[in-house]
Amino acid sequence: KCISIRLVVPHSVGSATDVIMRAYAETINRRGSGPLIKVINVTKKSVKWQRIWSKTDGCNLFATTQSLVADHLANKRKPIWSWLKPVAMLSRTPLLVVARGGLKDATLANVVEKALQDPNSVGIGEARSPLERMMLMSLEDMTGARFRIMTYDTGRESYSALLAGKLDIGIISITAGRRRVEHKELQALAVSSEARSSVLPAVPTLKEEGIRGTFSIDRGIMASKETPDELAAEIAGWFEKASEVPELADRLAEYGTIVVYKGPDEYTRYFENLTADWQEMIQRAAGKQTRRRAS
């Protein structure tokens, strides 16, 4: 039995993943249904990170997104999700498709139509992130359009270029875009979820704009591969009960995030299906004309 469980977040304090994991941990700790859960922020490159995953006692959990799939598909030398044990999916955070403030006739339908006519006519930024690349590829796959992709080292650089009017459209977090949209610095085109966001309720969904499909950042927790199934199921149960607490849903909604719970088996199938779907999407993209990338 674990006296306490460390929930390792490979991002800084205050990041979206950190906020979501702390909300869950605090909800579980208040209920007192199991060992105390402590959120630990550790970078992937640190020696401490390696020590954590050398432990097989089930007392360490790892917060993750679909980046485990995206990173491996981009570089087969990267760890694959199946090296770990899926415990539970916890949340889904839709994204916001936006246009620069000065773009005329800025609707998603108009932007897509323009890109379909001329793939070099609509510029979009992309950071050097495999997960961000998959989100952009999802938008292209759903619309059939190809955009003129400008590559940046970081998401912050790409976002700054969008605000400066150097790009036509972008895919950003709903919370990051809210203030910019309200101040007319950006124009909201669509949210990438099935339902409208409570953060920006006036913004239509992709479906409302005539586009079938959704994409989002999905967060969950993993354990070491050797963690006993019984222990993984017990831990998942704590998070499942927390997911049913209305106050948690309200708290996450402030960040444009929806509570979505999947247990160990369902979360495993989720990763299997996501890997297959993204591999097929990559093959479809490769079968079409090479996208122009400018750095």
What are these regions (language model features)?
Residues 69-76, 90-104, 137-142, 218-221:
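Periplasmic solute-binding protein
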Residues 59-61, 78-96, 123-125, 208-212:
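A structural signal for short loop-to-beta-strand junctions that line the ligand-binding cleft
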Residues 92, 106, 177-244, 273-276, ...:
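C-terminal lobe and pocket-closing loops
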Residues 99-120, 203, 209:
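Flexible hinge/capping segments at coil-to-helix
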